[in-house]
Amino acid sequence: VRTFRVGILGNLATRLGISAVPLLLPLMIQIAYKQSAVTSGWIIAPMALTAMFAKSYVIKILNKFGYKKTLMVNTFIIGTLICCLGIPDVNSSIYWFIPIIAILGFFNSIQFTSMNSISIADLRNFQTSSGNSLVSVNQQLAVGFGIAFGLIVLKFYESSQELIQHETHNAFRLTFLSVGILTILSGFVFRKFHVSDGQNLRSK
């Protein structure tokens, strides 16, 4: 089923970047900004709050713009926000990250809900159960791959001391930029959707 294949692939591709953020940002705040684990945890807390808030808007957004346009534009926004996490220098206030994380949580929620629902939209009744299981497994794999990918990129930049000018914080900044760009590029996967895809869900 085409929508299932594209949904699974898009889910995996976009989560590579998205899943790296909850690890990289607290790590950067602790290492580069010399803050406690508690402080770094509170910095990313708004992501969960806005994610819950976004749930009430997902259906309205999908009904108005459709799945294809929503996922492509939303992925671009998420990637741009991840890139923005690399803007502040080491002398900036850590509270600069709060509005970015809050907005990111909102769009993440839209992304996850849209990807999960379109993935099983065209499955037949006897395929729905196994389809849901595969979507769930794919999510777990994507989270693991995303964390690993983020750490690999960070390690690469940390080993390039001339590139980061012997400043660990610059390694994090370049990592966020790389992860953000990857996320933006992953949005092209959703071009394989048709404008009419998900119409059966939108009418409900």
Q: Language model features by range: what are they?
A:
Residues 1-158, 167-197:
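12-transmembrane solute porter fold
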Residues 162-164, 196-204:
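Short, Lys/Arg-enriched, Gly/Pro-containing loop segments at transmembrane-helix junctions
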